Amino acid sequence: RYGVDVCYGIPGFKVHGKACVILARDPDLNVRLDVAHIATGNYSEAAQSCFCDTHMVTRDPVYVHQILNMLLTAMHKKAYLDTPKDPIIWMSHTGMRDKLDQLIQDACRNAKLYGVKYAQIRIKCNNICDDEIVKKLYDAADMGVQIHIVCRSVCTMRPRKNLKITSIVGQYLEHDRLFIFGQDGREEVYMSSADLMYRNLDRRIEFMVKIPNKAGLGIDYVKYLKGNIF
């Protein structure tokens, strides 16, 4: 009745990503006022009172365009054909797993070339049990990459040399997924709706976005990991 078009996405894939784009224009100034939002948490009032999640709201036209393009793909409205030269957002089953593999490989190369100071991985997630990702992280730790995983629930990994695994137990449910690569102010920070599980990476519609460096989330999160709450 109100012109809402309800889409059910790609058949056979559960939609688990959380994102929206508002397209608007100021008629007086004739300028775009588009806004994009992407998050690790659900659009649910109940979740907001007891979950810890990460949200990003931006008017950056690059982010707005890529998030809109991704949403149209997830809605099965178009094929993801106009892949940008420098993507800042990835969708499961169309590039997210490959991007994570590349980031882990880059950390291994940095450990070999520059030492552990520039080869660090920090992961915060609900679950980690994807066999391929687990093996790659074990291999990275064996190559000298310093890895710290904060996992709330299912974890099929065990601590070992260069690999620390902890959980946070507190008043709120830790629900965000963050992947941080690098150290000393040169971190690359990614947030995602996906846990590191086969079903999320290959059988669901999930999103992962690179956080702008100016957001400062990487540095703040490193301090958070060094706290005494573990």
Residue ranges of predicted features:
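Gly-rich Lys/Arg/Thr-decorated short loops/hinges at beta-loop-alpha junctions or inter-strand turns
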Residues: 78-89
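PLD/PLD-like phosphodiesterase catalytic module centered on the HKD motif
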Residues: 1-48, 57, 62-64, 93-230
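Prokaryote-biased recognition of long, low-complexity C-terminal linker/tail segments
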Residues: 49, 69-80
